[in-house]
Amino acid sequence: MNIRQQLVQLLNLAMVLSTAFMFWKGLGLVTNSNSPIVVVLSGSMEPAFQRGDILFLWNRDKYVDIGDVVVYEVKGKPIPIVHRVLREHKVTNKDRKVRQLLLTKGDNNPTDDLSLYAHKSNYLDRDEDVLGTVKAYLPKVGYVTILITENKYAKLGLLGLMALSTLLTRE
Amino acid sequence: MFNIIQRIQSLSNFYLTVSILLCIVTTVVSIISMFLDETSSIPAQLSNVVISTNLKYSRSFGSVGGRPKENSKILFDLDMDLAPLFNWNTKQLFVQLVAEYPTSVADDGAKVTYWDSIITEKKYARVHVNKQRGKYSVWDVSDSFQGRNATVKLKWNLQPYVGFLFFGQTKGEIEVAYPAT
Amino acid sequence: MHSKFRWVCVDTQFCTHHQNLSPFSYISNPSPMSFSYLEGNIDFKGQELANRITKKLITFGAIISFLVGFLSDNILYTVYTFAAFGLLTASLVIPPFSFYKKNPVTWLPKKSKIEIQH
């Protein structure tokens, strides 16, 4: 009897997790972005974005406009960066395809992002590097995730709370 | 609700739900008020815009392989009042002085920023600068601007406390030419 | 003669609480006094009241907070007002006040032998 209960509880947990996963992936499909919701990690866009703010991305625009805030990932560096488009150019490739090249800069940074880009590139490629443009914003809600990943006391505290709650509900 | 823990859970659950609803209502009200305020035609007075160019040879100024790259700088006068954009949901305004010039590739051409500024409060929304120097030394993907004609305009971005970001442009563009090479 | 002892599960928490024990033992021996005091239990009418207070107060607080912020042109007032309403509701609903315990449940008298029929 006990094992069955445990299995049912496990099944419920699996249902909750897979529903959340489906929602996340579905949102990624709609917005055409790998990570449609991001948490701001650095202060490079202050005073507009603070650490812990939540950004909603949209990636279905063919071209990014100047002044848009984009989230991009440089090839080879796994950290996504949220900065504003300073300059945009369009060039044609050898195979007649039009690429959009972008130069970005964080509002709170003194210089543009040239030093952050891949070694030989002077610009970002809209199709390859940009994860999406920021369309909507929610303040401070994501600060919990930052606390958990960076603060070891918060991590222990959360684990303690979770352990406590599983113990108490089972009586 | 019979247990303290249950009451805490139920209360925080409901509070969170209502908070989210409040955010959504604020967002919708912001969209409606932006639409009603006719923020698409705020006048701006751009005058005495002068673009100057010189050649640079370092990578931080766009030079590739040591070849000379034409860099440009701007000098301008600007007079505008962006106070109508400041509502209860405005966190900051980001304004950019943008030059748009034709390229052989696209209809709308390339867009570059010469100067930007952040306005955080309504009392600073009145911008009046004379002989202002641009912040950035701007270069094109090609080696030179080749004396093209550019349209210089002022774009703004409204950052809300919660909701959608709004973008717009002031009324008052000016045509300038890059100096001939 | 079979005598069926029927009981209705009012709250699932009550039922899962004592799953390991015999199904009727909860009625004959509820939680000891000290434990239920720590849990902050309140009776059903009190739960209804607490539920109504949270829903009405928080909804009202949301509307007031929105108006305060909108009319004073400052969104921070919305945040502060709504936080204040949240704290007010929490202080009214979470502690087990005596006005939540006005209608206690009357349990059936304890029997010396309980006849269980499969």
From Swiss-Prot, chain A:
Its main location: endoplasmic reticulum. Residues 157-168 are annotated as: C-terminal short (CTS) helix. The gene is SEC11. Keywords: Endoplasmic reticulum, Hydrolase, Membrane, Protease, Signal-anchor, Transmembrane, Transmembrane helix. It is found in: Endoplasmic reticulum membrane. It is an enzyme of class 3 (hydrolase). It comes from the Eukaryota. The chain crosses the membrane at residues 7-24. Residues 1-6 are cytoplasmic. This is Signal peptidase complex catalytic subunit SEC11.
